[in-house]
Amino acid sequence: MRINPPTYGSEISSIEKKNRGHIVQIIGPVLDVAFPPGKMPNIYNALIVKGRDTEQMNVTCEVQQLLGNNRVRAVAMNDTDGLMRGMEVIDTGTPITVPVGGSTLGRIFNVLGEPVDNLGPVDTNTTFTIHRSAPAFIQLDTKLSIFETGIKVVDLLAPYRRGGKIGLFGGAGVGKTVLIMELINNIAKAHGGVSVFGGVGERTREGNDLYMEMKESGVINEKNITESKVALVYGQMNEPPGARMRVGLTALTMAEYFRDVNEQDVLLFIDNIFRFVQAGSEVSALLGRMPSAVGYQPTLSTEMGSLQERITSTKEGSITSIQAVYVPADDLTDPAPATTFAHLDATTVLSRGLAAKGIYPAVDPLDSTSMMLQPRLVGEEHYETAQKVKQTLQRYKELQDIIAILGLDELSEEDRLTVARARKIERFLSQPFFVAEVFTGSPGKYVGLAETIIGFTLILSGELDSLPEQAFYLVGNINEATEKAMNLKT
């Protein structure tokens, strides 16, 4: 476990004896601060601007550059409205520190680790700095293993790697939030793990909706907050670029505590990883750096690497990260998504077409990919079943134009059989979710990987050709499908 430098308290009174400087220039969210000779703060140190006399001002900044002549350039994490030249600035002597541990569950924090949910202060004395080194190679768990989610379409066709990084692609209204909440629920029940959600530069309304839905579905337990399964960290669209650039690190730091100290499996959600890059680009321009390709910051790869390399499995536990990826103008060659792809182990693509058919989760079985789907990692049986499922669905996709023009009757006997099995597979890839029980009335189902493979093997073998396709819709394992078929006949 890594040891961290001492922390600073949130009260200015506790840092009265620290170095003091004063503001000499303000350009938007960027401040230049002069310090006495020989008392310069380090890069990434947190500075606190103290209001004059009775003014209650508490603006936190982070040192980004040492300019010479005893001056530093810092980026503000809060609005800089009301700041003036000459105001006193206190060097805390340490990077931004945030609360960590079980008391963070069920709470909402900002980039500085301050609770913003009006539920009072966080009951913890344990804090970590947000700038931490990635685990040393000797600490890493290099064994590749599957992270079972209990969601059939994910586990069979695009399995997640334990301690891996998954890109989540999908537009509005296709079920991203429900899928995220189901994963949070399943990791808590099946793996005894917890989750941290980092809202990076997205809409405040979306953050509020997610919080309300989590309370409604039981992921956040209002009556007993300590039984909640997730901690939320928000740095929304309206906040300064410094806050949006660092909020991902705040969420990651909270996740690292659960992995390194509590030795748990953790799910870390980042929504949206593109906004992290976008905020870095804004800060880079404000600091006067020469832009690189398409106007992005020259340090793009370094910034992305410093975040992504901390997301990994160690011998203590794992952080498995699911990152929503916005692709600007649908251009996959744009430097921001292209840099992100280099770090991903799997992609989960949500399809509007499947959502329109009522097949949930609307994960596209042909577009979703995973580097884990190899015979030596998942076994021959799993690999063969997944490939046959994809081949059947691909053939069905190719035949759809012919069916639309000529109808099913014009197909050969073999193709008709393929279509019938593909439609059953498509429906069997749907699944009732625990977090959707309150909306659908159907009890949620966690389906183990072994049960999933058996179910699809039976459909592909033709043993279930006599069952109606609606028997496979929104069920858990294959036994439930056969029971549903019996009920449909009676």
Curated annotation (Swiss-Prot):
It is found in: Plastid thylakoid membrane. It holds the Pfam family ATP-synt_ab_N. It is a peripheral membrane protein. F-type ATPases have 2 components, CF(1) - the catalytic core - and CF(0) - the membrane proton channel. CF(1) has five subunits: alpha(3), beta(3), gamma(1), delta(1), epsilon(1). CF(0) has four main subunits: a(1), b(1), b'(1) and c(9-12). GO terms for biological process: proton motive force-driven mitochondrial ATP synthesis. Keywords: ATP synthesis, ATP-binding, CF(1), Hydrogen ion transport, Ion transport, Membrane, Nucleotide-binding, Plastid, Thylakoid, Translocase, Transport. It catalyses: ATP + H2O + 4 H(+)(in) = ADP + phosphate + 5 H(+)(out). Transmembrane segments: none annotated. Its EC number is 7.1.2.2. One of its GO terms (cellular component) is mitochondrion. Produces ATP from ADP in the presence of a proton gradient across the membrane. The catalytic sites are hosted primarily by the beta subunits. PROSITE patterns: ATPASE_ALPHA_BETA (PS00152). ATP binds at G170, G171, A172, G173, V174, G175, K176, T177. It comes from Cuscuta reflexa. One of its GO terms (molecular function) is ATP binding. CDD domains: ATP-synt_F1_beta_C, ATP-synt_F1_beta_N, F1-ATPase_beta_CD. Belongs to the ATPase alpha/beta chains family. It comes from the Eukaryota. InterPro entries: AAA+_ATPase, ATP-synt_VA_C, ATP_synth_F1_bsu, ATPase_a/bsu_AS, ATPase_alpha/beta_chains, ATPase_F1/V1/A1_a/bsu_N, ATPase_F1/V1/A1_a/bsu_N_sf, ATPase_F1/V1/A1_a/bsu_nucl-bd. This is ATP synthase subunit beta, plastid. The keyword Ion transport applies.
